[in-house]
Regions:
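A short acidic, Gly/Pro-enriched loop at the edge of an enzyme's catalytic core
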Residues: 1-7
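Active-site residues of response regulator receiver
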Residues: 10
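C-terminal substrate-binding/active-site "lid" region of AdoMet-derived donor-dependent transferases
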Residues: 15-132
């Protein structure tokens, strides 16, 4: 009836599930309230070479960012990192209690192949510039 100040999501760690929870509960959050999402940083898992948790935590952070990117007028996003923990994201609500979030649409992103290829292309470009001199 009056809304809540804080929502903490530490669920099954499936990106779509986390996004669904944020979308559902956002309207119940008071203005200046926050949704916290646990386990969004893969570094501790990557250091342990735990591929499954690394992927899951990265995808969870991606889903939190997608929610934010589709709702920038309603909220802000802060991400907290600690190399000994799995990170925490905070969605801070700027809009009034009862405000429904926008539907989350996929935001364009570059191809992961280009992310891997880019550093090599930069090196080649520098090499060609040096050869040209």
């Amino acid at each position: 009836k009056n809304g809540v100040d804080l929502i903490f999501i530490d669920s099954c760690h499936e990106a779509q599930h986390v996004q669904k929870l944020m979308s559902y509960y956002f309207a119940y959050l008071k203005q200046d309230g926050a949704i916290f999402v646990d386990d969004i940083d893969s570094l501790p898992s990557r250091l342990k070479k735990n591929i499954w948790n690394s992927i899951v935590y990265d995808l969870t952070l991606d889903s939190v960012k997608e929610f934010y990117y589709n709702n920038t007028e309603n909220c802000s996003l802060k991400v907290f990192y600690n190399h000994e923990a799995n990170g925490l994201a905070m969605i801070y609500k700027k809009s009034k209690f009862g405000t429904q979030p926008n539907k989350v649409n996929k935001i364009w992103n570059y191809n992961i192949f280009l992310k891997v290829l880019y550093p090599y292309l930069r090196r080649l470009s520098r090499l060609f510039k040096q050869i040209k001199k």
